[in-house]
Amino acid sequence: MTNKNSPNPNIEMGGQCNKPYACDYQDRCKSLLPKSDITPFTVLPYIGKDKKLIEFMKSQGTTDLQKVPSKFFRDRKDYAPGYHKIIQDHHKNNKPWFSLDLKNIFKEFSFPFYFMDFETVTQGVPIIKGTKPYYHLPFQWSVHKLESIDKEIKLNDAESFLDFEDQDIERKFIESLLKAVGEHGTVFVHSSFEKSVLDKLKDKDNCKDLADKIDKLISRLKDTLKIVRKNFYSPLMNGKYTIKNIIKAIPSNISYDV
């Protein structure tokens, strides 16, 4: 429970804002900070919260991303080589970065393209037979279809599924999904979440007869998170690779702003 009229804590933002859980009011605190044209070093994935880097930047009296020495940069196999340097450089020139491979990567994918997203819910007291407390129950999917490169995806063209109470919800979820994505084309997801849901569904007693079809769907999945991490960055993303941040950086008529 919170008191909206209580004063803001007289303490600087720091690691405590995310421990033991992320505070829901960080945006409120950030809005009170002095406005600055400086991009903070905390946008750097993984090392932005590194204790040694934080102590170094404190000793220098700055939070400026451009002041981070390269000795702190680290490579990760799921990101572009030198991605910390890429982020630093492209915040400096305020331009997006593309790998030379990006165009060729998409040439390898076959149309139609399907863009698939799942939502799950955890129930403290499960109401669906065969589930347990805090089991991730899939209750919603949406699929947007792109027939060819010269077509345009419209939001109202999406197919979707939504159910909360049907005792056979998982069976209906996967049956309707398999029908929506057909048997051909490339299915894009953002992260491994959708695959993990499909893997669990094919082992459910009421879905085992669909296991082969689910496996074929899984074989068509392409993870856009992996593609973006290795091949694209924009200062508008502020070091984050979520769909909400990527949308800000690419030409689109879609917005997550409320």
Question: What spans do the regions from the language model cover?
Answer:
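Cysteine-cluster motifs in flexible loop/terminal segments that predominantly coordinate metals
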Residues: T2-P40
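Short coil/turn segments at secondary-structure boundaries
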Residues: P9-C17, D101-F106, V258
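Helix-hairpin-helix
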Residues: P34-H84
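Conserved RNase H-like, two-metal-ion catalytic cores of nucleic-acid enzymes
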Residues: W97-E183
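Flexible loop/turn segments at secondary-structure boundaries
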Residues: L32, P96, V121-V125, D150-E152, ...
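Charged, flexible boundary elements
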Residues: Y79-I105
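Conserved DEDDh/DEDDy metal-dependent 3′-5′ exonuclease domain
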Residues: M1, N156-V258
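Short conserved micro-motifs at the rims of enzyme active sites and ligand-binding pockets
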Residues: K30-S36, V125-I128, N231-M237, V258
